[in-house]
Structure formats: structure tokens, C-alpha cells
Amino acid sequence: MARYIGPSCKLARREGADLSLKSPSRALDSKCKLEQRPGQHGAVRKSKLSDYASQLREKQKVKRIYGVLERQFRNYYKNASTKKGNTGENLLQLLETRLDNVIYRMGFAVTRPAARQLVSHRRVLVNGKLVNLPSYHVKPGDVVALSQRAQKYLCVQESLTIKDQHGSAFSWVEVDSEKFSGVFKAFPDRADLPSDINEALIVELYSK
């Protein structure tokens, strides 16, 4: 299946949630009515879903937040289920260690799609080596940096400014904005991750 490149508002309305697909400096457009489904005459969202529908919607929401396709997501789940500890938390940790997500968390890009572009266009180095795979998994202690060319991008500089204005610092990454680099210090704890994600529903869905 091809990656979705349409309006981000449509996805947000489909899931009834802000998927962080727009810059924090731009609130969701007033036309983006999250309580209604996509379409000019989108029906108002039902207050109660079946268990299966709730599980499916949660999976779709998380896939869209992290920009992962179905096959990738299923592989992440299989990997998470073989690790020690809570499968749902393991799944979120795997998603958080994707290089595109780390670039986003460090504040070098305002959205994950923008971070994915930086990686795909060969503008990111890990431990001094060029990496162009958005799905590359960063490990604790890895140093992530932007190329000299990327450091001059206005979008990168604006993103760092937005990060400072919103105070969006994360405890598991340490960023040196002046050097356009950061260290992935540790795997994030569940308490550090978004509370609006219910990973237990995803585990229930795949456990059937």
C-alpha cells in the first residue's frame, strides 16, 4: 500500500484526534472538526464503538501518528511480543526509536513527515555516518546530527525555534541546538510517552 500524501486534516478527522501531522505553531484548522468523520457532510462520530472497532481504530491512529504502514507495524508488534516486559510498551518503544521519530523528538523537524524527508534525502548522520532509512532504530548512546547542508535549512531553524518556544524537551534525548546534534540517552518510559495512546487495545487486536 502506498504512503498517504493527502490532507492531514482528513486523517485527523478519521481518527477523531490530533495526530501531530501539523506544526505546533499551527493549530488544527477550524474546518477540521474532529468530532465529524471526513467528507463535506461527514456524520457525527458515534459515542460508542464495538470492542473490535475500538481496537482497530487505535491501531490505525498509532500507525498514522508514526507514519508506519501495515506490514511494518505488524512486524513491530511481532518483535515487541518476543521481548521481555509489556508488549504494548515494547511496541511504543520500537516506534519511538525510529530515526525519523528521534529527529522529530529532538526538534529538528516540526512533524514526523518532515523528519522523514530529512532522513530520506540523506541529511542525517548517526555516529558520524550517513543514514537514509527512516526506520533505522537508534540505540541509547547514539549521536544523531544534521548534515552541514541541512543545518542551513530555514525549516530546521524554525523548528528549533518552535521547540524552544513550546518547551518541548524530552528526557530521553539531549539536544545541542547550536551544533544541530543530539544524543539518544535511553529508551523512554511509558510515563514519558503520549497518554492518549491505549496500546492495550492494539495488543488485544493482534492477540486474537
From Swiss-Prot:
This protein's name: Small ribosomal subunit protein uS4
Pfam families given in the database record: Ribosomal_S4 (PF00163), S4 (PF01479)
Molecular function in Gene Ontology: rRNA binding; structural constituent of ribosome
Biological processes, Gene Ontology terms: ribosomal small subunit biogenesis; translation
Family, similarity comment: Belongs to the universal ribosomal protein uS4 family.
SMART domains per UniProt: Ribosomal_S4, S4
Coiled-coil parts of chain: none
GO CC entries: small ribosomal subunit
Keyword Ribonucleoprotein: yes
SUBUNIT field: Part of the 30S ribosomal subunit. Contacts protein S5. The interaction surface between S4 and S5 is involved in control of translational fidelity.
Keywords: Ribonucleoprotein, Ribosomal protein, RNA-binding, rRNA-binding
Physiological role: One of the primary rRNA binding proteins, it binds directly to 16S rRNA where it nucleates assembly of the body of the 30S subunit.
